């Protein structure tokens, strides 16, 4: 679609580190830009506003901001938030799973990843441990694993462990500290862990352009964490195992691979028209 108006960058793309309700929208550069953006938006005709809305949809996990503020179909909080954490699908459902593809008639194509490699930008950047500095509001993270484990500590109110996680750049130690979180409830964690990984990876990839471009370049291929040891986030098999190419033979659930595919879908939707914006 070729726009008929000069376009202004939507706030969630202008400030990719900001969450929906951050104080950053109420002070400083975020507040100033938001007022500037909405003043500009109100100068558009209804037809132009509809055109802009089609070009730049809100991120799916911004549930209380919509182009039409008086909509009656605002998401129910109990469906889209859990312990204050936004989820992407109603009640935190998974968009993809092994069942999605296991009986597919199409020839499936895979992208395997596992260990990080800070020296290159290739499939290793899909690892939770890959160095990939990004921010979420006022917090800066070394990698997606740090975000995940820090959110785990926050969820259960363990400020001491949260601080330790945020003070290290060693992903292995982050994971170990995450296992020490006090007041841990596995049932609560199971309800929200997938959404935490979705959120963290959205911020990671939207703030690291080379990595984002690589993620988008995988098209509709199935992303696979080929960890022979992880049967939850990975497939429990190495990439060289012939069973890795047969989803029915996977020993694990591949939650990380499927989460990254969902992140890929969302980034593709939200950023599909950024080339139309002024540099």
Give the location of each predicted region.
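Charged, low-complexity intrinsically disordered segments
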Residues: 2-279
């Amino acid at each position: 679609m070729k726009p008929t108006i000069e376009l202004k960058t939507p706030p969630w793309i202008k400030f990719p580190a900001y969450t929906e309700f951050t104080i950053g929208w109420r002070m400083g550069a975020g507040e100033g830009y938001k007022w500037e953006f909405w003043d500009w938006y109100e100068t558009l005709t209804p037809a132009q506003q509809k055109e802009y809305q089609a070009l730049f949809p809100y991120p799916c996990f911004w549930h209380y901001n919509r182009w039409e503020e008086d909509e009656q179909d605002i998401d129910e909080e109990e469906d889209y938030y859990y312990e204050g954490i936004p989820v992407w699908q109603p009640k935190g459902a998974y968009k993809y799973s092994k069942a999605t593809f296991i009986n597919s008639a199409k020839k499936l194509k895979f992208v395997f990843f596992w260990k990080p490699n800070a020296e290159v930008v290739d499939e290793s950047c899909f690892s939770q441990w890959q160095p990939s500095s990004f921010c979420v509001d006022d917090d800066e993270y070394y990698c997606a694993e740090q975000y995940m484990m820090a959110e785990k500590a926050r969820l259960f109110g363990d400020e001491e462990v949260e601080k330790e996680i945020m003070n290290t750049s060693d992903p292995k130690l982050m994971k170990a500290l995450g296992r020490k979180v006090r007041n841990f409830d596995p049932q609560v964690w199971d309800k929200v862990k997938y959404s935490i990984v979705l959120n963290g990876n959205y911020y990671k990839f939207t703030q690291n352009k080379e990595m984002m471009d690589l993620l988008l370049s995988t098209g509709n291929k199935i992303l696979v964490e080929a960890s022979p040891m992880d049967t939850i986030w990975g497939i429990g098999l190495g990439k060289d195992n012939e069973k890795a190419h047969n989803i029915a033979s996977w020993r694990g659930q591949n939650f990380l691979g499927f989460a990254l595919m969902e992140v890929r879908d969302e980034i593709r939707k939200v950023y599909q028209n950024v080339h139309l914006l002024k540099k």
